[in-house]
């Protein structure tokens, strides 16, 4: 069992984009920014514990940081990890519920 303190450090923020919104509507998948060293098992446990939903599968990828310029200086943003968390049939989690 993974300790609860570690679970709180795994999930960083929801990733809000057009692709993430489409994934939520079509395949009941939420997209999250997670800690770079987080495993699929830790992500699954954190989502189930914090949001009280059943997770079917977790897919992860590392997004490479962009090269940015500020004048003549060239820098690079940090890499970060993205997780696609597919919820089981009948489960629902709404991060971006609009004001009505």
Swiss-Prot record:
Keywords: Ribonucleoprotein, Ribosomal protein, RNA-binding, rRNA-binding. GO terms for biological process: translation. InterPro entries: Nucleotide-bd_a/b_plait_sf, Ribosomal_uL23-like, Ribosomal_uL23/eL15/eS24_sf, Ribosomal_uL23_CS. GO terms for molecular function: rRNA binding; structural constituent of ribosome. The keyword Ribonucleoprotein applies. It comes from the Bacteria. The keyword Ribosomal protein applies. One of its GO terms (cellular component) is ribonucleoprotein complex. Gene3D superfamilies: 3.30.70.330. Belongs to the universal ribosomal protein uL23 family. NCBIfam families: PRK05738.1-1, PRK05738.1-3, PRK05738.2-4. Part of the 50S ribosomal subunit. Contacts protein L29, and trigger factor when it is bound to the ribosome. One of the early assembly proteins it binds 23S rRNA. One of the proteins that surrounds the polypeptide exit tunnel on the outside of the ribosome. Forms the main docking site for trigger factor binding to the ribosome. This is Large ribosomal subunit protein uL23. The lineage of its organism: Bacteria, Pseudomonadati, Pseudomonadota, Gammaproteobacteria, Enterobacterales.
């Amino acid at each position: 069992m993974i300790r609860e303190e570690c679970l709180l450090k795994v999930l960083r923020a929801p990733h809000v984009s057009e692709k993430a919104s489409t994934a939520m509507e079509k395949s009941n998948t939420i997209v999250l920014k997670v800690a770079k060293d987080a495993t699929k098992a830790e992500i699954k446990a954190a989502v189930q514990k914090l949001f009280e939903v059943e997770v079917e599968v977790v897919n992860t990828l590392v997004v490479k940081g962009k090269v940015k310029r500020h004048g003549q200086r060239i820098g690079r943003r940090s890499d970060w990890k993205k997780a696609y968390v597919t919820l089981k049939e009948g489960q629902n989690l709404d991060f971006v519920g609009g004001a009505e």
